[in-house]
């Protein structure tokens, strides 16, 4: 059989997906985190892999799904939170724009799986399956009640799950995980399709969503999940030392308030007394596309007048950030390679080729 006749759609998908293969899995496994630091990698959306100086590995909000893939149904799902928010009927054109940079089924070394809330782009059945099948049988799944309910429904044993609410602290080796208040108002109107939100007092946020503060021996990381801006960030900043803060940023479509703006990101950094503020989530959805450089431009305008004590950092999906080594950098660039140029003699017809 000729090559073109033996190739199928399935063989094409298996040969190209996930786009990064196990490259990032291998990089994370090989990383030796120096004392007094922590390393983290952006997995897309709000997915983060955190590794401490003691070699503790935790992932939070690692999601391996996709967005819209067809024009087949022109209408939004009945009762969707965006429909409730803005009274819309048309399909939301949210296509996934970020490649898959980590293979969940190539994960072997992990000490905890966490989720901030139960929205589809923050918790993933494939990740749960991969960890259950390929990793140690004592890896905990940590999240608010709605997330634990999902995991148990997927088949994760109840004894492997830890329900957290604001004020709880979970120790995973040398990382201390503090569950803090979340400010994700969209989560409160994520309801069964037949349930009305109008005129009904919403249930509490604590069962639905939490923010996390990861305290490592080398520094602290604040993960805000899908939280909107809240004055309460200042309380968190008063109560905890926060080195790096991650915030969900995006260009909200007309009639929608679901992501923080550039001004919100700066207010969050100031309120938390953070040293570095990093936007995320803006990478993933085509209809929330936003330019993170806007945050830096606004920071430049305000920093001297308002005496900001933090800097913004513009990241790339799949990239590594090391605290405090990268604290004075403003932008990430993927490794460019070719650092070993001219370690062997070039093979060229003559030097003018150079």
Swiss-Prot record:
NCBIfam families: PRK11709.1
Similarity remark: Belongs to the UlaG family.
Biological process per Gene Ontology, one example term: L-ascorbic acid catabolic process
Molecular functions (GO terms): L-ascorbate 6-phosphate lactonase activity; manganese ion binding
Cofactor(s) for this UniProt protein: a divalent metal cation
Transmembrane residue ranges: none
UniProt keyword Cell division present: no
Pfam family of the protein (one): Lactamase_B_2
Main location: cytoplasm
CDD domains membership: UlaG-like_MBL-fold
Cytoplasm keyword on record: yes
InterPro entries membership: L-ascorbate_6P_UlaG (IPR023951), Metallo-B-lactamas (IPR001279), RibonucZ/Hydroxyglut_hydro (IPR036866), UlaG-like_MBL-fold (IPR048021), UPF0173_UPF0282_UlaG_hydrolase (IPR050114)
Species name: Shigella flexneri
Function comment: Probably catalyzes the hydrolysis of L-ascorbate-6-P into 3-keto-L-gulonate-6-P. Is essential for L-ascorbate utilization under anaerobic conditions.
The entry's keywords: Cytoplasm, Hydrolase
Induction: Induced by L-ascorbate. Repressed by UlaR.
Name of protein: Probable L-ascorbate-6-phosphate lactonase UlaG
Source organism, top-level taxon: Bacteria
EC primary class: hydrolase
GO CC term, one of those recorded: cytoplasm
Location in or out of the cell: Cytoplasm
EC number assigned by the record: 3.1.1.-
Record field: catalytic activity: L-ascorbate 6-phosphate + H2O = 3-dehydro-L-gulonate 6-phosphate
Biochemical pathway: Cofactor degradation; L-ascorbate degradation; D-xylulose 5-phosphate from L-ascorbate: step 1/4
